[in-house]
Amino acid sequence: MAPETAQSQTPETPMRDLQNDAPVTDTLEAGNTDERPSKKAKLDDASTPDNNANNIAPQRMRGVAPVKPEFIIPRATGTEPQPNTDDAAEAARHEGAQGQEAGKKKKKKPTGQNTNRTFGSSQDEKGLCPSRIFTPEFSPGACQWGEKCRFEHDLRTYLKEYKRGDLTTFDGVCPVWDAKGKCLSGWKCRLVGSHMTERETADGRKELVLVEDEERKKKAQPLVPFAVEDGTANIAPIEAKIALNRKKVKTPRADAYGSWLDKTSRELEKVIHNREVHEERGAESKTDQAEREKEDNRAQYLEPPFLPSEKRRIYFGPETPVLAPLTTQGNLPFRRLCIELGAQFTYSEMALSMPLIQGQRGEWALMRAHETEMLPPTISPGADVVQGYDHSKDFRFGAQIAANKHWQALKATEVLSAYTPNLRVIDLNCGCPIDLLFREGAGSALLEHPSKLERILRGMNAVSQEIPITAKIRMGTRDNSPNALKLAERLILGGYESSTLGLGAPGVAALTLHGRSRQQRYTRQADWGYISECAALIKRLNEKTDQVTDTVREPDPRTQPNGGKTWFLGNGDCYSHLDYDDHVNNAGVDTVMVGRGALIKPWLFEEIQAGQYLDKSASERLSLVEKFAKYGLETWGSDEHGVGTTRRFLLEWLSFACRYIPIGLLEYLPPRIQDRPPSWRGRNELETLMGSHNYKDWIKITEMFLGPAHKDFRFEPKHKSNAWEAEAEG
């Protein structure tokens, strides 16, 4: 089915044929509930121009999505709910800790965010013993608990009394078995009827057995040699996590570097103090003494096993749009979907360093990637790659971590490089705005401590072996004092302390700038003018044409990544191919990192590749929901628990996907991610349903593929009021 396309418009112009100045006609009537195949929008005949001087097109209202009048539903006065905010996309996994404090406060009316969200549970009434899950009925394995086992051992009793009936979705075929030829949930699968049979034994009894499909198993060969049976990679051994939890894992590189860093900090204070004393006394030998002290410090310096110039080289370009690290929403099924739609690079959800060091399973699970994320990216022939870049050794998936102390970041980086070596990069989150991390000194709090941030990144480079180190920052913490320009220069050249010790550049391979301050959050548009200034600065530094007053700060080539080139990515409000092209061509960034835009319409990556708007029909969008459901069952399992987990994360995505307003319903293009829509109805019932901001409708959509929710399943939306305000400031 060919996607519907729309012509690009200026903000002040209605949707019209720009060549003939004719309005685009609707291909679907507003009240039609029968969905037609999407197609290119018709254009009125240019031979009949409108010469009526009094027919003046209305101007686009600022801050409000320009929905065509025939699709708008009038709202009763005084019923407008509170608007959504988007901070949850960055830190929803950690909102529980914030909720602990919030729970102590005085009760308020139900508005704002649900910080203490609960999701209930999805479990069998009585579980099947693990010794029975994959075995034939009459050949069970030995149960290690014997008579004390609290699980069911009789297979027929379990299937009849304790397990809910099979799902009737997916044509009654288990999507895991259909893709792999074998279901990894065994008898617990909610579609077990599609891969089980009853056979007659030699003594005439009927035995239930699981069925495997050899042809499907042959087709499901791993795409990369280090992927496991379920098609995923980057899975740390359980023994390693146990050893980490028991503090039996040594981190020699991090420990040695941390000791050197502590000693160097004390020596640096002496150097600076002595220099000040000599300047006061007018000593002529202060330069010689400073050089001698510098050499002494360099002699004590621990040479890392891999210098930044020796690490694996990476590439970012106009043809490689990037999916941003998204907490909760950036799960494996969603990343897999975005890769399929054209995203070239992905990141894990933000992982906290301390839980990684402690071997906590939940944090290490964030490093799990699909095998499609382990393939090399698709780059254009003749792309401006750096010298030494080996495309065959590149990956698409990187990890993002957060830390508030250098030793935490270093130890986390060392264990990541040891147990998940197939990471493209390890990215340090220096932009997360949530209060929990900020108060602890992590996330965007590091922006206020540039020297500390430089030490952390330099140390991460020293212990990450061949994995490059990158960073994601914001403009600053406060609106009136952005510091990203100075910070970017420091992270590329090194600061005063580094030049004093002769350490060279910190070796950051790529830098991503979100064009907002922490204080601003999502209240205003991202500042791409500031991002452009930063891009110009980094370009000058990369080309070594910037006039550096202090020549001592010129970095040592050995400490520079990618042959002396630091890649620069822009982030903020990218919602169409026009936004992407404008940022790459005019803002000067190497590529764009897409966050909320991909959550609302993941086919944004397809639009970027095609260079045009894609007006996905409701059925096409629903097919993406079905894919997510299938990928979720492959990731979390097709048993009761896996179905519940898939439903929960599908609902999380639908809380963003419902914000999409189809292109065919808009009077003006381009669409803007910050615009708030009035209440609207779609071109058919399904389109209206998918645009609903009522979470009960989201649950209804999940039931199309995952069946009725478990009686104990609960879902609380992030916001107690989960619809847009009808009016926005002009």
Swiss-Prot record:
Residues where FMN binds: 325-327, 400, 472, 514, 571-573, 595-596
Alphabetic keyword roster: Cytoplasm, Flavoprotein, FMN, Metal-binding, mRNA processing, NAD, NADP, Nucleus, Oxidoreductase, Repeat, tRNA processing, Zinc, Zinc-finger
Any one Gene Ontology BP term: mRNA processing
Catalytic residues as annotated in Swiss-Prot or TrEMBL: 432
Gene Ontology MF: a single term: flavin adenine dinucleotide binding
Cofactor(s), names only, from the UniProt record: FMN
PROSITE patterns assigned to the protein according to its UniProt record, in alphabetical order: UPF0034, ZF_C3H1
Protein name: tRNA-dihydrouridine(47) synthase [NAD(P)(+)]
Class in the EC hierarchy, top level: oxidoreductase
Biased composition (Basic and acidic residues): 33-45, 274-298
GO cellular component terms attached to this protein's record: cytoplasm; nuclear periphery
Provenance organism: Aspergillus oryzae (strain ATCC 42149 / RIB 40)
